[in-house]
Design a protein with these regions (language model features):
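Accessory interaction regions appended to the cores of large information-processing enzymes
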Residues: 1-169
């Protein structure tokens, strides 16, 4: 048997709700393609809730086989610093897993550094820029995209989310 079309929305809703909680660290699942190939239908026992639950169970069974990864937000960064602190700032960006894309002299003994960096590494960046430049530097940071989290950090993120989930429950 096949699934009647009037139950397709229930299947989709079950899958969407399941995607809100990913298998690795509990973060929402994105960029998922799912296809409903077949299913069974019984005139008495089939209900929207049954198909919604079936979709959720299929997600939980199938997603680990798809080799999911954790994505992290990457920001586009422009930092204006005095020329004499440019090297220190480049080192700081490298420590924060940043990738320097270019540098430009912007006059008045100032340099603008263009870079991309994980947003998670930029929490205290405003304080650092003020300290490093004695208040004469500034920066802009805007979300750019999501990139795969390096595998060396994945275990720590998963452990942290499990610990946090344990504290909440």
């Amino acid at each position: 048997g096949s699934v009647p079309k009037n139950f397709f929305p229930a299947v989709e809703k079950g899958l969407r709700e399941a995607c809100a909680h990913g298998p690795l660290a509990g973060y929402p699942v994105v960029n998922l393609k799912a296809v409903l190939y077949d299913g069974s239908y019984h005139p008495v026992d089939s209900s929207e809730m049954a198909f919604k639950t079936a979709a959720s169970l299929a997600y939980k069974a199938g997603l680990p086989q798809a080799s999911p990864i954790i994505l992290e937000p990457i920001g586009s960064l422009k930092v204006q610093v005095p020329d004499d602190t440019t090297g220190d700032m480049m080192g700081e960006l490298n420590k924060r897993r940043g990738r320097v894309l270019g540098m430009n002299s912007i006059g008045d003994n100032m340099t603008e550094i263009e870079a991309e960096a994980p947003m998670s590494e930029m929490q205290d960046f405003a304080t650092l820029v003020r300290q490093m430049t004695q208040g004469s530097g500034n920066f802009t940071l805007a979300f750019l995209r999501y990139d795969p989290l390096p595998s060396t950090l994945e275990a720590a993120v998963i452990a942290g989310s499990k610990q946090l989930a344990g504290e909440i429950q």
